[in-house]
Amino acid sequence: MSLEIVILAAGQGTRMRSALPKVLHPIAGKPMLGHVIDCARQLQPERIHVVIGHGADLVRERMAADDLNFVLQAEQLGTGHAVAQALPFLSADQVLILYGDVPLIQLDTLQRLLAQVTPDQLSLLTVDMLDPTGYGRIVRDDQGAVQAIVEHKDATPAQRQIGEINTGILAVPGKRLADWLGRLSNDNAQGEYYLTDVIAMAVGDGLVVASAQPLDAMEVQGVNDRMQQAQLERHYQRLRAEELMRQGVTLLDPQRLDVRGEISVGRDVLIDVNVVLEGRVVIEDDVHIGPNCVIRDSVLRRGAVIKANSHLEGAELGEGSDAGPFARLRPGSVLGARAHVGNFVELKNARLGEGSKAGHLSYLGDAELGANCNIGAGTITCNYDGANKFRTELGDDVFIGSNNSLVAPLKIGDGATTAAGSTITHEVPAKNLAFGRARQKNLENWKRPEKIKK
């Protein structure tokens, strides 16, 4: 059967106390709405409709994609009214209704829910709670069949004792939806059009109301304030940490790892505490990552080592290479096999060949280094003249003395050496020694300045 999905994302989220629409607040570095959309896409629907209201322009701008149809709910008059805004666009056999502030919903749960939908049967997602205060209750008859959903504010004292609650997630036969939504009333405590009222209508029309429950109740936990956002963030991170450990990663403290993207890992990887992985990160076998590191959109080849307090973005570390402690590798940085950058070294769009080393206190930008080069402490590639950037190219086996300024554009040939303290402005041929500093002078009988007596 064909499927369309409606995601409700129009709410203001006043309890977040934020100018940012609630559905754009992040979980694991991604907007909550983005998590829901990604899960919805896995179901391969005909189309995904996103109902927007508060901050509509910003939500549309941030989440724009060819497979999304944004539908405006100008007034927030309830969930039933929100779904009704999408009715003109719906024609599928099944319609699944999701929520933009319920970011941890899982594919398996939705597949089980949809499997129960037929032309004469709808399915809703429920969960049992010890404290169901504030949630709509699932009312069943003596045979256990679902009869209705009663919102907390409208529930009787007896109904408020029910522990099974409505998550809001619902899958219905598409051809029935327009009729049910057209019959909704706002005669209730909140003066809103409740989507949940379609359950009683379906029962009255002779349909069967099936139900399913998630394997993990946190899947259907919504976010209404910063505390709930933090709770879901930690739960999400715990799940990702467990997933990594099942794949052969040693986490020295699973509670002190943050994963904010798509991570591919090999075996026998070790990750120390307070590590943040963002974007697309590939970690091959036997990689070690030290504490307090941030790694974004990078590739770490087999046996690479990232030492403490290092920051990598858009970088690639070759097999057996190492970086840090306190190294910064910016986009376009590549370390060849067994290359090394040490403490307080910054690379930007720079490639170090196999076995090359920059031990400490250096900046290498827009540079290409051959194999087995040695970069002395305090070396800087002067790659920017205030208007344009230029490259520095070193051959193999180049030795750069300490405290050098390499003024680009510049080429240094194989086996060349530069003296400590040099400013190199012209090409250095292979195997040459280049000096670029003032000659030392010694003044005899020099007397140090003395303090002026007051």
From Swiss-Prot:
Binds 1 Mg(2+) ion per subunit. Keywords: Acyltransferase, Cell shape, Cell wall biogenesis/degradation, Cytoplasm, Magnesium, Metal-binding, Multifunctional enzyme, Nucleotidyltransferase, Peptidoglycan synthesis, Repeat, Transferase. Its cofactor is Mg(2+). GO terms for molecular function: glucosamine-1-phosphate N-acetyltransferase activity; magnesium ion binding; UDP-N-acetylglucosamine diphosphorylase activity. InterPro entries: Bifunctional_GlmU, GlmU-like, GlmU_C_LbH, Hexapep, MobA-like_NTP_Trfase, Nucleotide-diphossugar_trans, Trimer_LpxA-like_sf. Acetyl-CoA binds at residues 377, 383-384, 402, 420, 437. Its EC number is 2.7.7.23, 2.3.1.157. Pfam families: Hexapep, NTP_transf_3. It is found in: Cytoplasm. GO terms for biological process: cell morphogenesis; cell wall organization; lipid A biosynthetic process; peptidoglycan biosynthetic process; regulation of cell shape; UDP-N-acetylglucosamine biosynthetic process. Residues 1-226 are annotated as: Pyrophosphorylase. GO terms for cellular component: cytoplasm; membrane. SUPFAM superfamilies: Nucleotide-diphospho-sugar transferases, Trimeric LpxA-like enzymes. Residues 248-454 are annotated as: N-acetyltransferase. Pathway: Nucleotide-sugar biosynthesis; UDP-N-acetyl-alpha-D-glucosamine biosynthesis; N-acetyl-alpha-D-glucosamine 1-phosphate from alpha-D-glucosamine 6-phosphate (route II): step 2/2; Nucleotide-sugar biosynthesis; UDP-N-acetyl-alpha-D-glucosamine biosynthesis; UDP-N-acetyl-alpha-D-glucosamine from N-acetyl-alpha-D-glucosamine 1-phosphate: step 1/1; Bacterial outer membrane biogenesis; LPS lipid A biosynthesis. Residues 227-247 are annotated as: Linker. Catalyzes the last two sequential reactions in the de novo biosynthetic pathway for UDP-N-acetylglucosamine (UDP-GlcNAc). The C-terminal domain catalyzes the transfer of acetyl group from acetyl coenzyme A to glucosamine-1-phosphate (GlcN-1-P) to produce N-acetylglucosamine-1-phosphate (GlcNAc-1-P), which is converted into UDP-GlcNAc by the transfer of uridine 5-monophosphate (from uridine 5-triphosphate), a reaction catalyzed by the N-terminal domain. Homotrimer. NCBIfam families: glmU. This is Bifunctional protein GlmU. It comes from Pseudomonas aeruginosa (strain LESB58). The gene is glmU.
